[in-house]
Each structure stands twice: as structure tokens, then as C-alpha cells.
UniProtKB/Swiss-Prot annotation:
Disulfide bonding pattern of the chain: none
Entry's localization field: Cytoplasm
Annotated family: Belongs to the TACO1 family.
Organism name: Clostridium botulinum (strain Langeland / NCTC 10281 / Type F)
UniProt-listed NCBIfam families: PRK00110.1, PRK12378.1, YebC/PmpR family DNA-binding transcriptional regulator
Keyword DNA-binding appears in the UniProt entry: yes
Protein's name in the database: Probable transcriptional regulatory protein CLI_3132
Lineage: Bacteria, Bacillati, Bacillota, Clostridia, Eubacteriales
GO CC terms, sorted: cytosol
GO molecular function, one term: DNA binding
Gene Ontology terms: biological process: regulation of DNA-templated transcription
Keywords per UniProt: Cytoplasm, DNA-binding, Transcription, Transcription regulation
The keyword Cytoplasm is assigned to this record: yes
Pfam families: TACO1_YebC_N, Transcrip_reg
């Protein structure tokens, strides 16, 4: 099946800061704190926590770091209260952008996000200005390896309830509805599969091709956003030029 995940295209352009493991761990740690505060410290009874732990393990986050974040959120250690906010706006050339933040100071976060937009010729918009262009989907990314049969994996995913299966350069991308994400992930885990990524994200209905000049400006915007500790996720509908490198 052919989908429209563009996972490899987007992943390659997410920003060099995502290679800094410590920053990734800080952001996931915040997600764990919020998940525990909302649904309790047991992954068995807290689906959101279970999903965040799966994301943490996919990013090679040490178990003791995961446990420390859970203890912090459950009151065994001092914890900060975070607020979840999604900002919307347009990047250069009208690229639709969603920015998820977890913050203890929304004025600081709003200012930082607005600066990132305007610095590269974009602008932060009002709630709802671009979110209608995206859908909440589960996305499971599996590395291509010897012995992993594409047809078998596709049937396994579809039988478990996946909506789409796509083969990209180095990975397979399984897309699910938000509701079926946990079921599909658990079915694939039961088959012994390991994931590069497994999480709920906002997927654009369509992608917009951008030229190299716009790609350079937009990458700078992404770098600024993703270097902000409050920013958890950045979603967009840009399709970078084939073979483009910053």
C-alpha cells in the first residue's frame, strides 16, 4: 500500500538538535510527568503513559531515567506542573505548522514560538488556522533489516487494524487511527518487532513542495523551535526538495 507519510523526508530535516540525546530525554521526561499526573503511575492502567514509555524506549532512554520521571510525577520527587499548549501558524511560503509545547510559563513559550515564526518570514496564527489540515494518527516506524519480509509485515499490520503501510528508503511506516494505535502497536510488539518510533502525531492531509530557498529558511525555523526545551513536537506539511541538504 502506498501512503503519504513522507517520514524519511521530514525526519531528515527535523533539525540537528534532535541528535542531542540529552535534549530528547528532557522532552520525553516532561511527557512522562504529564501522563502520570493525568492517569497515574501504572503503565498497565494508563495508556498515555504506556505510549510515552514506548517512545522513550524507542529513543534508547535508560530505564532508571524513565523511573525517575515517573517518581517525580507521582510525588516521590519534586515535580513542576506543566501546561500543554498547541500553537498554530504559517512558515515561509505559507507552510502550515503546528507546535506542541509543555511549559511552566506560557508567556515565555508564546514569545519564543512567535519569534521562531517571524524570524524566517512566517507568522503565528489563531487557534484553528491550520489544524484542520491535519489528522491525529498513530505512526509506527520499523527499520528495514535482513530477514524482515515486507509482505508479511504489511499483512501483519493490516490484520491488526492498521490503516496504511508504506515502504520508504530505510524504513517501513505503519499508520493507524488514533483509536487503534495501541492495539496495532501491541500486536506488532508481540511478534518481536522493535520500533524506531511509535507515537500519536498530527499528519497533514496533503504535502506542499517547497524550493531550496524556502527549505533553507524553514529549516532555520525548525532548528530554533526544536532547540527550545518547551517545544515537544513540530508538525508541518512541507515536502523538502529531493536530495536537499542544509
Amino acid at each position: 500500500m502506498s501512503g503519504h507519510s513522507k517520514w524519511h523526508n521530514i525526519q531528515a530535516k527535523k533539525g540537528k538538535v534532535d541528535a542531542k540525546r540529552g535534549k530528547i530525554f528532557t522532552k520525553i521526561g516532561k511527557e512522562i510527568v504529564v501522563a502520570v499526573k493525568q492517569g497515574g503511575p501504572s503503565a498497565d492502567s494508563n495508556p498515555r503513559l504506556r505510549d510515552v514509555i514506548a517512545k522513550a524506549k524507542a529513543n534508547n532512554m535508560p530505564n532508571d531515567t524513565i523511573e525517575r520521571s515517573i517518581k517525580k510525577a507521582s510525588g516521590e520527587l519534586n515535580a513542576v506542573d506543566y501546561e500543554t499548549i498547541t500553537y498554530e501558524g504559517y512558515g515561509p511560503a505559507g507552510i502550515a505548522v503546528l507546535v506542541d509545547v509543555l511549559t511552566d510559563n506560557k508567556n515565555r513559550s508564546a514569545g519564543n514560538v512567535r519569534y521562531a515564526f517571524t524570524k524566517q518570514g512566517g507568522n503565528m496564527g489563531s487557534t484553528g488556522c491550520v489544524s484542520f489540515m491535519f489528522q491525529s494518527k498513530g505512526q509506527i516506524v520499523i527499520e528495514k533489516k535482513d530477514g524482515l519480509d515486507e509482505d508479511e509485515l504489511m499483512m501483519m499490520a493490516l490484520d491488526a487494524g492498521a490503516e496504511d503501510f508504506e515502504s520508504e528508503d530505510e524504513v517501513y511506516v505503519v499508520t493507524t487511527s488514533q483509536e487503534d494505535f495501541g492495539t496495532v502497536r501491541e500486536a506488532l510488539e508481540a511478534e518481536g518487532l522493535e520500533f524506531l518510533e511509535a507515537e500519536i502525531k498530527m499528519v497533514p492531509d496533503t504535502y506542499t513542495a517547497i524550493d531550496e530557498d524556502t527549505a533553507t529558511k524553514f529549516q532555520k525555523m525548525l532548528d530554533v523551535l526544536e532547540d527550545d526545551d518547551d517545544v515537544q513536537n513540530v508538525y508541518h506539511n512541507a515536502e523538502f526538495p529531493e536530495g536537499w541538504e542544509e
